[in-house]
Regions:
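Alpha-helical transmembrane segments of multi-pass inner-membrane proteins
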Residues: 121-146, 170-219, 223-237
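Long extracytoplasmic/lumenal interhelical loops at the membrane interface
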Residues: 148-152, 291-360
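Membrane-interfacial helix-loop-helix modules of multi-pass inner-membrane proteins that assemble, modify
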Residues: 79-81, 132-174, 341
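Aromatic-anchored transmembrane helix interface
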Residues: 61-68, 83-109, 119, 123, ...
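Transmembrane alpha-helices of multi-pass inner-membrane enzymes
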Residues: 184-189, 231-234, 389-399, 405-448
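Hydrophobic transmembrane alpha-helices and their immediate junctions
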Residues: 232, 356-398
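N-terminal signal-anchor transmembrane segment
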Residues: 1-52, 71-77, 414, 446
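A juxtamembrane structural motif centered on a specific transmembrane helix
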Residues: 1-7, 49, 246-255, 261-266, ...
Length: 448
């Protein structure tokens, strides 16, 4: 019982980091900042235990790159004389995310006396499933939604005006992008379990993949990016394994796990689609493109039609080089002279690449891209066995920027922090020996 309570608390902390909100009974700060404070405390404890102060070179590099983003942003708004400081404080944001990620890894360590990529991914998967369940309860139980709205602040007024589903901090493209990143991580674990011939362990992973795919798309169709990349990875990995083991009679694919879960999930979805108008509308929104394709012969959605009009590019060299200094709508600038965009962001575009170029030019776009790539590199170098997860995470980030400007640094920072933590193995051994009274020579599960 105590163990499960610890796991639930740890899951709650992971959710606080991955899907931050502001609790109304503590409106001073959002949960991301609170997790960053917790991570800072954990870091201080580590340093005190080790009795030395050392900063990994990789951490300095990624903070340097984040600092470059802030400096370019500062140049952009000063040269253009705009008040939009959206990315001027990017260095601070990077520090907060990394500190919070370290706190998450330490929380998992304190609960399980070990921390690894599969553990982190499993926590992310079930936190995303939890968010999907909360979103469904919000839609079907008004009293529950009233309770959630009275407890947390997450811009729910705007979400309700837009008619969008939301969980506990998971909504719109921010939630969808993190669902997508989690899906590609789950797909990697599924391949790993298939190679290990552990079919039982695949069932909860397949279940979480399907739940996040179905309900996650109802929340934000950006989730489809992770669905596509994850399924493509599963497909090619399965082809590779079949080719390598085609004469091995004892080899079993993961098809059985998928069939088992789908035999349960498919009838449930069909039943509610045919009996609940509300669920039908949610399904048609989440998979609008597929419904349009099968009913009209054309794959299209309302958002893709709008997106086509948002690919707007600068018409002068100066904007390409240093941007216009606007990321948000220029109506927020009282000194702006000209016709402002009536709705949406600057130049009426929500496309990530366009917004970055209009804000701080190509140099800024390259700098923030370098942050994402290097975060993936840190994780891949420190955790080489799982490098495909980080490669797919970075890939998802750049695909998502074709639609919105949301980045996946929170996802990548988790594994970058885990990679940093692997350098403190001796400290982890000492901590476990102190807490469990084990001999220091006894082996300790460590991140791979």
């Amino acid at each position: 019982m105590v163990k499960w309570l610890k796991i639930l608390i740890t899951g709650f902390l992971v959710s606080c980091f991955y899907f931050p909100v502001i609790y109304k009974f503590f409106p001073v700060s959002n949960t991301k900042n609170l997790m960053a404070a917790f991570g800072l405390v954990c870091l201080l404890v580590v340093l005190i235990k080790k009795r030395e102060f050392s900063v990994p070179k990789e951490l300095l590099v990624i903070l340097f790159l984040a600092g470059v983003v802030s400096i370019i942003s500062l140049f952009a708004i000063n040269i253009n004389q705009t008040p939009d400081r959206t990315y001027v404080t990017y260095i601070r944001s990077a520090i907060i995310w990394l500190s919070g990620a370290f706190g998450v890894c330490c929380a998992i360590w304190l609960t399980h006396k070990r921390v690894s990529v599969p553990l982190v991914v499993n926590y992310l998967a079930w936190v995303c499933v939890f968010q999907c369940v909360i979103a469904l309860l919000n839609e079907f139980i008004p009293a529950f939604r009233t309770f959630i709205d009275a407890t947390v602040e997450q811009g729910q007024g705007m979400l309700q005006d837009l008619g969008r589903m939301y969980g506990l901090g998971a909504s719109l493209d921010v939630g969808g992008s993190r669902f997508a990143a989690t899906l590609v991580a789950i797909s990697f674990l599924l391949v790993q379990k298939s190679e290990d011939r552990d079919r039982i362990a695949q069932i909860p992973l397949v279940f979480s993949f399907i739940v996040i795919t179905v309900i996650g798309n109802m929340i934000a169709r950006t989730t489809l990016v992770g669905v596509g990349v994850g399924l493509a990875y599963l497909f090619f990995a399965e082809l590779r394994m079949i080719g390598l083991r085609k004469f091995d009679k004892d080899y079993h694919t993961s098809l059985g796990a998928w069939l088992l879960v789908l035999l349960f999930a498919a009838p449930v979805c069909v039943f509610f689609y045919n009996t609940s108008l509300q669920f039908q509308e949610m399904m048609r929104f989440g998979f609008e493109g597929f419904f349009n394709y099968f009913e009209q012969g054309e794959w299209s959605t309302g958002s893709t039609s709008t997106l086509e009009t948002m690919y707007v590019w600068p018409d002068n060299l100066k904007t390409w080089l240093i941007g216009d200094g606007y990321f948000e709508n220029q109506r927020n600038d009282p000194n702006y002279i000209g016709v402002a965009t009536r709705r949406g962001f600057y130049m009426g575009t929500d496309v990530g690449y366009c917004r970055y170029i209009f804000y701080f030019g190509i140099p800024g776009l390259l700098a923030i891209s370098a942050v994402m790539i290097y975060a993936g590199v840190i994780a891949a170098q420190g955790l080489p066995k799982y490098s495909h997860i980080f490669l797919m995470g970075v890939l998802c980030n750049f695909i998502i920027w074709l639609k919105v400007s949301t980045d996946l640094f929170p996802f990548l920072s988790l594994f970058a922090a885990l990679a940093f933590l692997t350098s403190d193995i001796e400290f982890l051994k000492q901590l476990r020996a102190e807490e469990e009274g084990e001999d220091e020579e006894e082996s300790v599960p460590v991140p791979e």
